[in-house]
Amino acid sequence: MKILLCCAGGFSTTMLMDSMKRVVKNSKKLDENTFTFKAIPVDLLQSEVEDTDALVIGPQIAHKLDTIKPIIEPYHIPYVIVDKDTYGKMDGATVMKMVFIAQKKAQMNK
């Protein structure tokens, strides 16, 4: 599963990405070899979106959703917007749960 994390500059999202990687690595149910993560600034989304399975949007760019949706909709990529509290705690476990829920919903709507 390729998970793309997107924020204003890609720096703080890298810390969240590392937390998500630890969750996958420490999980008994998930195989870390089947996951790839990448943190990018929103300005690079168009060039990075292909082959993405889920998009994680940082709270600092939630207001750009109207710009983001037209980029990801042709690829049918499920997305989550991380709330400020979860983001501030760098809570990778909660974000991974959000990603899995978004993926399930997307599969049910196919």
Task: Give each language-model segment a name.
Residues 15-16, 49, 65-68, 91:
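Short glycine-/acidic-enriched loop or helix-start segments at secondary-structure transitions
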Residues 54:
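Short, Asp-centered acidic motifs that coordinate Mg2+ and/or phosphate
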Residues 78-110:
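Ser/Thr/Gly-rich flexible loops in soluble cytosolic domains mediating phosphotransfer, phosphorylation
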Residues 9, 60-62:
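Short glycine-rich anion-binding loops that position phosphate/pyrophosphate groups of nucleotides
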Residues 63-86:
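A short, gly/pro- and small-residue-rich
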Residues 21, 25, 66-69, 73, ...:
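Class I S-adenosyl-L-methionine
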Residues 2-44, 51:
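Conserved active-site segments centered on acidic
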